[in-house]
């Protein structure tokens, strides 16, 4: 048989495997540097028992960069960890790693070695009487697929959640499966408008994960943030204080504790924690972004305290904080060019000091980006609409972008903000007797989108009467 025929047979077998090469991970080329950086941070600074998968993901990223020899090194590390941490179920736990080995060797043209790893997968499938030669359905592989998807960004979260749910069906008390599920559900919360029931469920899965993983401080700080979201800040702060006394996963604890304290209004404490975290992870886009948000929060605090007219020392402090915030947001973008909200935050900071041209430039960069998450698209249209309404003095453009955001039907917190902003603008126009027919029609649309059909009809009827008064022919 020719080498070409061998290659085709091997390729037909490879596509049946369950591993990073067949999971259709959505990773854009500009995202790879930041993804690799976050993987290395996790390897170095996150104290976890669940670290085999991260070496597999690193191997896949190395392959995407054309570094197949480095990919093999990462896969060997994963193999060693399996023998060390999962010796009693090494076969099952090795399926993904072996699949990745086979793919990397195939891409290197080393077909005999690729076949060796295919044989390992096939033998394990036979051992467990699996009906497929190369595809094993088991909770452990579902879990690893979930971790890979979760690490690759928001556009993969729904699929990650499904994977962890599938894993939990097979083993509902497994600590790792519960941890992955809780983290993914927590991250998805920001994309969705949750009902009271769903919010309670999100809180429940985090508490369950903490119970099953009592030594995992990372999941504890996420629970703290969730409690803060739900108005239970005092209870959340207890978890934060406990986590800060631990030496485990300090870089991660510091960054999430900082987020907690910034949202609480304790911005100085948040900045102190962020600076400590940056000592160990200086290339973290997340940390630089959080620092920018802190500096901007301090600037807004001073403006509010001076009735938005700071003078003297306050003016100097505001100017200094604005420059610090701009510097941090620009650093964020340099480290992660696909950090969409960093462009928005940078634009809004420029708008605060009247640099509208620069603000417009950065808003346009955010609007032009290829964005997969509907909630994020809504959020950017919301912020740009606000910019046009309050800084650009263009109600037309503001309305256009509020409506563009609302055309995206995803139910989310951002959609609620768009509805509220459009409603306030329409009511203000009516109060000022400006474009009343159009504004009343917009109120009708808002009621319709809220499901308030009778109120919507009343608004539309009123708009028709007003239009008829203005133009009897109509």
From Swiss-Prot:
Reported function: IFIT1B is likely non-functional, lacking the critical antiviral role of IFIT1. Unlike IFIT1, which is essential in the innate immune response as part of an interferon-dependent multiprotein complex, IFIT1B does not prevent the translation of viral RNAs that lack host-specific 2'-O-methylation at their 5' cap. Consequently, it probably cannot inhibit their translation by competing with the host translation machinery.
GO molecular function: RNA binding
Full protein name: Protein IFIT1 homolog B
Domain of life: Eukaryota
KW Lipid metabolism (keyword) present: no
Keywords, comma-separated and alphabetical: Repeat, TPR repeat
InterPro entries in alphabetical order: TPR-like_helical_dom_sf, TPR_rpt
Database matches in SUPFAM superfamilies: TPR-like
Matching Gene3D superfamilies: Tetratricopeptide repeat domain
GO cellular component terms attached to this protein's record: cytosol
An annotated GO BP: defense response to virus
Provenance organism: Homo sapiens (Human)
Positions of TPR repeats: 52-85, 95-128, 141-174, 182-216, 218-250, 251-284, 305-339, 340-373, 378-412, 437-470
Pfam families to which the protein is assigned, alphabetical: TPR_7, TPR_8
The family this protein is said to belong to: Belongs to the IFIT family.
